[in-house]
Swiss-Prot record:
PROSITE patterns, per the entry: G_TR_1, G_TR_2
Name of the gene: prfC
Keyword check for Nucleotide-binding: yes
Sorted UniProt keywords: Cytoplasm, GTP-binding, Nucleotide-binding, Protein biosynthesis
Species: Sodalis glossinidius (strain morsitans)
Record's protein name: Peptide chain release factor 3
Length: 529
């Protein structure tokens, strides 16, 4: 392997995810980012109800109907001298587990905030997740072409609620109907806005210098005076950009713009490419793996069924941590101990797939999966190690799945097991009867399961309430005590999709009593994959 070439390839990679509250404009930003990366020529503006141009990243049937991104898609595109891997995460709050796992596969996040609303609930939760790994965050204040809150107030709110320092890089001139453009603090340049140009990349008029009389002519004397006043305040009250603090996850650069108007996105992308880290080292159960190591390693963070309705396939998304993937290379699946030849890994452009010849640390590749790969699986060139920190959560909501046609039990079980391997829901099979119980983190997931059982497995099913309020994975070092526990609690015991023993409790009171009664049994709320 040519080391210099390899080092250059890694240095060029930027792998990031977009996090936001639903409706903050994340899917539109994804579209416009791809437009700037020349990955698509005109952006399919999102969710024009009744229009045929659905956004490139919302590609599953149910997403198209609802206009929300339910599953994570992966898109790769070149920008300036970098090669950017963008992971689009579900914006809907029901899909937190999938999003959580996606955030373990990136080196940086872009936080999108609706500037009319400020910090919202979902943004807080996602920020907590990025904190666990001190992920660097860039912030895009979206929708400045609408009436927004005072920009200084927005910065204060981000600092106090999300506990991260703000360094404004760009600043809006006016907002709503009076929105005139953006001033770039580092470059001392003003970019003037033209509305109605959101579908393509337009040439933007630039005014150099804050004291340039041309600025007063372009935006009007009042707004120019207001801008100069605000900037004095901003420079006095906010933090200058500090790259080390950014990389430590302590400071976020702030960009203003409008995704729908396609304005300000390029400034944010320039910042991402300049400051976001190249592929970072990762922790395993035995050592830390550096991206610059020559031997290939990677982990699976997501499984997606039926990305191609014409083929009954499943694809495992794998983050390359080190080394280089080459076509037809032999890799060890550490969990099973088997060596497999990966002849046809995929790269993605949200739903469009193409086979790749090579991939480097930081890239996301797709492996065809016929039921043998699980979330959390590590692949290496023979070394026995396992990447850590890819969680599985105990579900909070439960339903019993019933068949309309009882003869389709076999297809139902197959469909549910495949969906559970994706990590969208968890399936539990009681030891005492033939029921099938599905557990999820959010209500919408049950609708997704029923819709996908019908469209992908031709199984008509419905769900009904079940007397379960919580579940815990069960472990015990003493086989004899575990057997006794199983004998006395059979009615509350189930096996999950991976045949792990779990306890389902009708109430928290029941769970706490059972815990007290069996001090030797461990009840776990999360499991490492």
């Amino acid at each position: 392997m040519k080391n210099e070439l390899y080092a250059d390839e890694i240095a060029a990679r930027r792998t990031f995810a977009i996090i936001s509250h639903p409706d903050a404009g994340k899917t539109t930003i994804t579209e416009k980012v791809l437009l700037f990366g020349q990955a698509i020529q005109t952006a399919g503006t999102v969710k024009g109800r009744g229009s045929n141009q659905h956004a490139k990243s919302d590609w599953m049937e149910m997403e198209k109907q609802r206009g929300i991104s339910i599953t994570t898609s992966v898109m790769q595109f070149p920008y300036r001298q970098a090669l950017v891997n963008l992971l689009d995460t579900p914006g809907h709050e029901d899909f937190s587990e999938d999003t959580y796992r996606t955030l373990t596969a990136v080196d940086c996040c872009l936080m999108v905030i609706d500037a009319a609303k400020g910090v919202e609930d979902r943004t807080r939760k996602l920020m907590e997740v990025t904190r666990l790994r001190d992920t660097p965050i860039l912030t895009f204040m979206n929708k400045v072409d609408r009436d927004i809150r005072d920009p200084m107030e927005l910065l204060d709110e981000v600092e106090s609620e999300l506990r991260i320092a703000c360094a404004p890089i760009t600043w809006p001139i006016g907002c709503g109907k009076l929105f005139k453009g953006i001033y770039h603090l580092a470059k001392d340049e003003t970019y003037l806005y033209q509305s109605g140009q959101g579908h393509t990349i337009q040439a933007v008029r630039v005014v150099k210098g804050l004291d340039n009389p041309e600025l007063d002519q372009a935006v009007g004397e009042d707004l120019a005076a207001q801008l100069r006043e605000e900037l004095e305040l901003v420079q006095g009250a906010s933090h200058p950009f500090d790259e080390q603090a950014f990389l430590a996850g302590e400071l976020t650069p702030i960009f203003f713009g409008t995704a729908l108007g396609n304005f300000g996105i390029d400034h944010m992308l320039d910042g991402l490419v300049a400051w976001a880290p190249p592929p970072m080292p990762r922790q395993t159960d035995v050592r830390v793996v550096s991206a610059r190591e020559e031997k290939f390693t990677g982990f699976v963070f997501k499984i997606q069924a039926n990305m191609d309705p014409r083929h009954r396939d499943r694809v495992a998304f794998l983050r390359v941590v080190s080394g280089r993937y080459e076509k037809s290379m032999k890799l060890r699946q550490v969990r099973t101990g088997k060596d497999v030849v990966i002849a046809d890994a995929l790269t993605f452009m949200a739903g469009d797939r193409s086979h790749i010849e090579e991939a480097y640390a930081g890239d996301i590749i797709g492996l065809h999966n016929h039921g043998t790969i699980q979330i959390g699986d590590t692949f290496t060139q023979g070394e026995e190690l396992k990447f850590t920190g890819i969680p599985n959560f105990a579900p909070e909501l439960f339903r019993r799945i019933r068949l309309r046609d009882p003869l389709k039990q076999k297809q139902l079980l197959k469909g549910l097991v495949q969906l559970s391997e994706e990590g969208a829901v968890q399936v539990f099979r009681p030891l005492a009867n033939n029921d099938l119980i599905v557990g999820a983190v959010g209500v919408l997931q049950f609708d997704v399961v029923v819709a996908r059982l019908k469209s992908e497995y031709n199984v008509e099913a419905l769900y009904e309430p079940v007397n379960v309020s919580t579940a815990r994975w069960v472990e015990c070092g003493d086989a004899k005590k575990l057997e006794e526990f199983k004998r006395k609690n059979e009615l509350n015991l189930v096996l999950d999709g991976g045949d792990n023993l779990s306890y389902i409790a009708p109430s928290m009171v029941n769970l706490n009593l059972t815990r007290e009664r069996y001090p030797d049994i461990q009840f776990h709320k999360t499991r490492e994959h």
